[in-house]
């Protein structure tokens, strides 16, 4: 059961306190990264005030790991009292004093890299992906990182796309993997986190959106002009994974060469994509004889999804 003091601090952290009273918050320990600690009213999320995540919501578990890596004892105690999970604390504690504090608060000893990685990635949520990133990133305790230990999970999720993340730096592989999983499972908070943290990986985000059929993220990238790729290269990437009807259609509307797309689908033996591309070619050549399910020139991702959610390839199409 939470103490009265802990409950009081939590209640205050959920209030909007005028700046002239911030010194009181600092005195009470409701202070982190040179800003007041703010909690979401309805969930266990910290509202960050520091850049690059200004205004972002961060789960208490993730915030706790950040505080542990900073050796911020008061904030570690505070977040743990509020319900943050100290389980992975020893993995990130950088000093003996922080390690001892984490043990006192219930941190788990002797966790290895694979246990942490597979344990968190078993459930694909924004919180777990960001938490996994915070545990492994810039962590001298994990300098002997061997990505091959996580290879089975990475390969299972990325399949052929794994060849795009091969790198001599293990951490780079994991960052691209986490980013890809965020896009694949349409985890908006995780996508936002990685986009703000790794702006130089915007092309990777675009590639993931195309390959994993996330037309919503693809549309956002295109509309905001975040990064540019040749449309035929986009179409080729979309055709590499079967049933990528949403992103294939989007690339088609943007002007992708449908004949080249048909060739790519044949080359990769993606039969369902091939039938779909044939239907799109019919739509382009003669809208009156095309399948009535398909409409031309739609770029709204919601409308594209609605249009294609019941689409079934017509195997009777001539090849």
UniProtKB/Swiss-Prot annotation:
Listed GO biological process terms: taxis
Domain of life: Viruses
Induction: Expressed in the early phase of the viral replicative cycle.
Keywords: Early protein
InterPro entries named in the record: ASFV_MGF360
Pfam families: ASFV_360
Family the UniProt entry places it in: Belongs to the asfivirus MGF 360 family.
Role according to the record: Plays a role in virus cell tropism, and may be required for efficient virus replication in macrophages.
Protein name as annotated: Protein MGF 360-8L
Source organism (scientific name): African swine fever virus (isolate Warthog/Namibia/Wart80/1980) (ASFV)
